[in-house]
Design a protein with these regions (language model features):
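Interhelical loop/hinge segments that connect adjacent transmembrane helices in multipass membrane
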Residues: 1-42, 88-97, 219-232
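Interfacial transmembrane-helix starts/ends
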Residues: 21, 25, 93-108, 115-120, ...
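Alpha-helical transmembrane segments of polytopic membrane transporters and translocases
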Residues: 30, 45-47, 57-75, 105, ...
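Transmembrane helix-bundle signature of multi-pass secondary active exporters and lipid flippases
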Residues: 38, 61-80, 109-113, 143-150
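Interfacial segments at transmembrane-helix termini and the short loops linking adjacent helices
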Residues: 55, 119-148, 194
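Helix-loop junctions and terminal segments of transmembrane helices
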Residues: 68-93, 157-162
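Membrane-interface helix-loop junctions in multi-pass transport and translocation proteins
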Residues: 121, 126, 174-209, 221
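Membrane-interface junctions at transmembrane-helix termini in multi-pass inner-membrane proteins
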Residues: 145-172
């Protein structure tokens, strides 16, 4: 179709418009669904704690979540700034090596914060919340490990987005949501808030590794190999 706007002729290809519209719909739907799934399964533990354990456990667990994941914004900021270079890179092997370097950087920065929480967590809890919240210490340490896995998961997530894996992400997050509900229930019932924290680690680990390895002939597996089997 020919359109004239301000004296200029424009040819509008209806087939291309349909193609790009479908692509944008699928891409947007994938990101929205995966984002909702992430938000949901990160809150499942709190809901199940309230139902299976007690309201006080929810309060203690909320403190553990707040402190154990409080440093996550640092790694997220680092990932966001680093990925502009990765997205602009056309060579797959170079992209994998850049993502692997970012993976290692996020890993070691996360280890630093985990060490701070491990050695200073009890003092921080007593200072901020009082001795009645000391029971949040072990879940807090476990959740800091979960936050490390989540940060590494963001590196993989962004790498999948680079290769337009929006539909894959939406399916993966939906599957993880279905897995997390029974897993959290069976761990929370006998172990309470510690079980809730353990379920977070298990879910984040499965999401980071096995589930991602199905994408694009194991490109995430190759990135992980480059991260920890080959150094700078």
């Amino acid at each position: 179709a020919l359109k004239i706007i301000d004296g200029y002729d424009f040819v509008i290809d209806s087939k291309k418009i349909k193609t790009y519209s479908r692509y944008m719909l699928l891409a947007g739907t994938g990101i929205v669904v995966s984002s909702i799934s992430i938000a949901l399964y990160s809150r499942i533990n709190q809901f199940l704690l309230g139902a299976v354990d007690s309201v006080s456990s929810v309060g203690i667990y909320s403190v553990a979540v707040t402190l154990g994941t409080s440093w996550g914004f640092i790694s997220q900021s680092l990932i966001t700034s680093f990925y502009s270079r990765i997205y602009s890179e056309k060579n797959d092997s170079v992209s994998i090596n850049l993502a692997a370097k970012l993976n290692r950087l996020v890993f070691f920065i996360s280890l630093l914060f985990i060490a701070v929480i491990f050695f200073g967590g009890r003092y921080i809890l007593e200072m901020l919340y009082g001795p009645s919240y000391i029971s949040a210490y072990i879940p807090m340490v476990l959740l800091s490990i979960g936050s490390l896995l989540s940060s590494l998961g963001t590196v993989a997530y962004r790498f999948i987005v680079k290769y337009s894996g929006y539909y894959f992400l939406s399916k993966k997050m939906s599957v993880m949501l279905l897995i997390s509900i029974p897993l959290s229930f069976f761990l929370i019932k006998p172990y309470g808030i510690t079980g809730a924290a353990c379920s977070t680690i298990i879910i984040e680990f499965i999401s980071l590794t096995f589930m991602n390895y199905f994408f694009c002939k194991g490109i995430i597996f190759n990135m992980h190999k480059a991260s920890f089997l080959k150094w700078w």
